A protein has these predicted regions:
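Class I S-adenosyl-L-methionine
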Residues: 1-193
Length: 193
């Protein structure tokens, strides 16, 4: 973990999910009207029941725009197989590095209505990482870093977008590419750091 605060938030939330999920539910439901919410730091849902709980919370707050990243592809596919009706205000990104990446499950997951597309980590010049150009588009070297990411992504997929690193800072008016239906099928990527 690069950032201890993020680790401890994840630890706290993991414990709350096991011991007192009502606290998580209450916090989610108390979000300000119309907010964009990034759900789950790591995107890994423990099981289908946890995934369904969060999807039901999204349905309870249709005014929110909720998005996330997941490697829990099997849980999504299992929930979908039950005939589950997904919330219209939620999108997830298929995070690279899933253990299901090179299986038939990848196509099933990518075909779900709540999956925006791939979120890929690509190898870039270490100089970009050393300068921390991946953290924000205002950082020195960010344009060069994003150009490098985009070039690598386009080797994989023609429709691609390089993440500048700071959620809500990539599109005008604080919009999030990873949570936008307009970016459906577009590979969004970052440099491995």
């Amino acid at each position: 973990w690069r950032y201890p605060a993020a680790f401890f938030r994840q630890l706290q939330n993991s414990l709350l999910m096991r011991l007192n999920p009502e606290v998580i539910e209450k916090a989610f439901l108390s979000q300000k009207t119309g907010r964009t919410v990034r759900l789950f730091v790591d995107g890994d849902f423990k099981d289908v029941a946890t995934l369904k709980m969060f999807m039901e919370l999204c349905k309870a707050r249709p005014d929110l725009k909720v998005y996330g990243y997941s490697k829990s592809w099997l849980e999504f596919v299992k929930l979908d197989a039950t005939g589950y009706s997904w919330p219209s205000n939620y999108l997830t990104n298929a995070s690279s590095g899933s253990r299901h990446e090179r299986t038939g499950l990848a196509n099933a997951f990518l075909g779900l209505p709540v999956v925006r597309g791939d979120f890929l980590a690509v190898k870039v010049d270490k100089a970009h990482i050393n300068k921390r150009a991946y953290q924000d588009k205002t950082k020195a070297g960010s344009k060069e870093y994003r150009r490098d990411v985009l070039a690598k992504l386009k080797q994989i997929q023609t429709r691609a977008f390089a993440c500048p690193g700071n959620c809500g800072n990539c599109l005008p008016q604080g919009r999030h590419a990873c949570g936008s239906k307009y970016f459906a099928g577009v590979a969004i990527g970052i440099g491995i750091h």
